[in-house]
């Protein structure tokens, strides 16, 4: 179950941060427009504030997305957004950096690249959930199957060679649960 894997990884991430830096994780206090319920204490002189993950108090209604796209959103994706709020979640998968987008009090919708870029509409169920690898390509999940992909959506990468065509996404995990259980907070 993704909620358990997410909680376990958030605990491990927090533990490693505290061991390395002596304090709970910190993020830029301006990561959200309004003060987050995840914030702990006050921002320091450099504008960083400690945070902790908390239970999601206002789950996203996936029925709207399911009706709009005529699909069934898989449980892993629903649980990623409806289990906990977190302001930072990153680690390493097979030596590559994985950085999830935060799930905050302000998270209300998912970003479908196919809504903005017609050349990639052959992947209508992929949503961006973060960044992957040294070049920060998009970390995407297929919201129907739950499979996790890396996908370079930077038009500059392919501008001349492919005239705006993107490479196909590359599978990196069979599910979000699989990804979270294989993720390590420190590079191995």
Predicted regions and their residues:
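A surface-exposed partner-binding patch
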Residues: 1-137, 187
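Short, flexible beta-strand-to-coil junctions
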Residues: 130-135, 142-145, 153-156
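Generic alpha-helical propensity signal that fires on short helical segments
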Residues: 87-91, 95, 145-147, 157-159, ...
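A recognition module on extended beta-rich or small alphabeta surfaces enriched in W/G with H and D/E
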Residues: 139, 150-187
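Short, solvent-exposed coil/turn segments at beta-strand boundaries
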Residues: 122-124, 140-148
């Amino acid at each position: 179950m993704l909620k358990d894997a997410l909680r376990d990884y958030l605990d491990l991430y927090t533990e490693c941060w505290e061991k390395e830096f002596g304090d709970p994780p910190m993020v830029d206090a301006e990561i959200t427009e309004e003060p987050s319920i995840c914030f702990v204490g006050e921002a320091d002189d450099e504008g960083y504030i400690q945070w902790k993950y908390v239970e999601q108090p206002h789950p996203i209604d996936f029925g709207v997305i399911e009706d709009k796209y005529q699909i069934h959103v898989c449980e892993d994706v629903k649980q990623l957004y409806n289990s906990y709020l977190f302001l930072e979640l990153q680690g390493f998968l097979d030596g590559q950096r994985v950085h999830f987008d935060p799930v905050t009090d302000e998270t209300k919708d998912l970003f479908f690249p196919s809504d903005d870029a017609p050349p990639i509409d052959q992947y209508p169920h992929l949503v961006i959930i973060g960044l992957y690898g040294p070049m920060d390509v998009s970390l995407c999940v297929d919201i129907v199957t739950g499979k996790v992909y890396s996908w370079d959506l930077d038009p500059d990468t392919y501008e001349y060679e492919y005239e705006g065509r993107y490479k196909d996404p590359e599978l990196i995990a069979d599910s979000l649960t699989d990804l979270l259980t294989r993720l390590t907070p420190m590079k191995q």
